[in-house]
């Protein structure tokens, strides 16, 4: 009994003396694997040189990150250079025409001649004589849209189709309904409208941009569904494509801060600075909804305004962009901009084509 009392007393004495020892000595007396994590890390830091060693390690890590970043940039630049080469890179096989490609190109002159050209034009005219079956849209004779919904009945003239905003608000729902209940005619209308839009001149293309934005504003204002199968909505991308082509030389100088490719790709409302950028961004936002396969364009696809396209006035695309061309022509320092803007507005041939050589017909 006395021995057990003495042993318990000695253990208490040792534990008390252990607690009175400095923390570093107590931890140092334990095996490394039994020390707390913080103590082990502290010991490692002390062995590596304390705070000075930590700064050196941070500098080393920073140098390694910089080296890795430089290597990634060099690899990216090397890949871009290889992609820009016609042969695809130093290890790619020689870039040359295959024998079948040579034969196909050489055989063109034996297959195509004056007779063949006349035949294909006649065939195309025949196909366009009946572009749609089931009598097209079959609009009632009393409908204000009956004449314009005919296929190939008459040539389009802007003044012949001019309507007021009030007239559109009154009769627009009827056209919207016909686009929905005549799917076969609507499909043909989408195809033909796209072909027409891609072949328009600048003035006609700007009027088509106004037609698109006016229609979108009308449908959303009336609370109707803006379907992406609607011929006017579905072809917003064609309007945008043709405008970028017709305005391309002007836009390269006019949009120096934000190139048109970047402007259209980002489609950000905060990039809008004028009617030119407004038209491009709005058409791009509509076209994007169509491209991703959505069934309809929602008001929030065009912005967070409680009134869709509240700031847009029908005709702003045509009038505003023509005014921007003239203003840029008189204000730009580039010596060629005067010619560029003038020809964009009035595309009459003056110079540029030098010969025409045709051994086929």
Curated annotation (Swiss-Prot):
Homodimer. Homodimerization is required for transactivation. Associates in a complex with RNA, and host export factors NXF1/TAP and ALYREF; these interactions allow nuclear export of viral transcripts. Interacts with three host shuttling SR proteins SRSF1, SRSF3 and SRSF7. Interacts with host SRPK1. Interacts with IE62; this interaction enhances IE62 transactivation. Keywords: Activator, Early protein, Host cytoplasm, Host nucleus, Host-virus interaction, Metal-binding, RNA-binding, Transcription, Transcription regulation, Zinc, Zinc-finger. This is mRNA export factor ICP27 homolog. Its main location: host cell. Belongs to the HHV-1 ICP27 protein family. It comes from Suid herpesvirus 1 (strain Kaplan). A zinc finger (CHC2-type) spans 253-337. Multifunctional regulator of the expression of viral genes that mediates nuclear export of viral intronless mRNAs. This immediate early (EI) protein promotes the nuclear export of viral intronless mRNAs by interacting with mRNAs and host NXF1/TAP. GO terms for cellular component: host cell cytoplasm; host cell nucleus. It is found in: Host cytoplasm; Host nucleus. Binds viral intronless RNAs and SR proteins through the Arg-rich region. Residues 1-107 are annotated as: Disordered. Residues 16-36, 80-99 have a biased composition (Basic and acidic residues). One of its GO terms (biological process) is regulation of DNA-templated transcription. Pfam families: Herpes_UL69. Residues 45-54 are annotated as: RGG-box. It comes from the Viruses. Residues 1-15 have a biased composition (Low complexity). GO terms for molecular function: RNA binding; zinc ion binding. Zn(2+) binds at residues 253, 328, 332, 337.
């Amino acid at each position: 009994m006395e021995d057990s009392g003495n042993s318990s007393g000695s253990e208490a004495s040792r534990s008390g003396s252990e607690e009175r020892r400095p923390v570093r000595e107590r931890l140092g007396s334990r095996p490394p694997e039994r020390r707390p994590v913080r103590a082990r890390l502290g010991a490692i830091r002390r062995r590596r040189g304390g705070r000075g060693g930590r700064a050196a390690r941070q500098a080393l890590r920073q140098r390694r990150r910089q080296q890795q970043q430089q290597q990634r940039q060099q690899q990216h630049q090397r890949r871009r250079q290889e992609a820009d080469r016609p042969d695809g890179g130093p290890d790619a096989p020689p870039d040359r025409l295959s024998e079948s490609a040579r034969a196909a190109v050489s055989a063109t002159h034996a297959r195509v001649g004056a007779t063949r050209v006349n035949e294909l034009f006649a065939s195309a005219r025949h196909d366009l004589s009946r572009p749609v079956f089931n009598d097209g849209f079959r609009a009632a004779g009393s409908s204000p849209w009956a004449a314009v919904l005919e296929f190939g009945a008459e040539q389009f003239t802007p003044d012949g189709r001019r309507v007021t905003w009030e007239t559109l608000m009154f009769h627009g729902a009827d056209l919207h309904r016909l686009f929905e209940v005549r799917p076969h005619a609507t499909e043909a209308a989408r195809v033909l409208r796209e072909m027409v839009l891609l072949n328009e001149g600048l003035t006609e293309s700007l009027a088509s941009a106004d037609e698109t934005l006016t229609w979108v504003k009308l449908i959303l204002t009336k609370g109707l569904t803006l379907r992406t199968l609607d011929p006017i909505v579905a072809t917003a991308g064609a309007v945008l494509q043709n405008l970028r082509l017709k305005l391309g030389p002007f836009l390269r100088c006019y949009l120096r801060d934000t190139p048109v490719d970047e402007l259209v790709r980002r489609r950000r409302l905060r990039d809008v600075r004028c009617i030119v950028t407004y038209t491009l961004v709005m058409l791009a936002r509509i076209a994007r909804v169509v491209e991703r396969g959505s069934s309809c364009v929602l008001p929030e696809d065009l912005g967070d305004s409680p009134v869709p396209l509240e700031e847009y006035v029908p005709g702003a695309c045509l009038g505003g962009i023509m005014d921007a061309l003239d203003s840029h022509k008189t204000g730009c320092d580039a010596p060629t901009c005067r010619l560029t803007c003038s020809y964009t507005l009035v595309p009459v041939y003056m110079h540029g084509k030098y010969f025409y050589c045709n051994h086929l017909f």
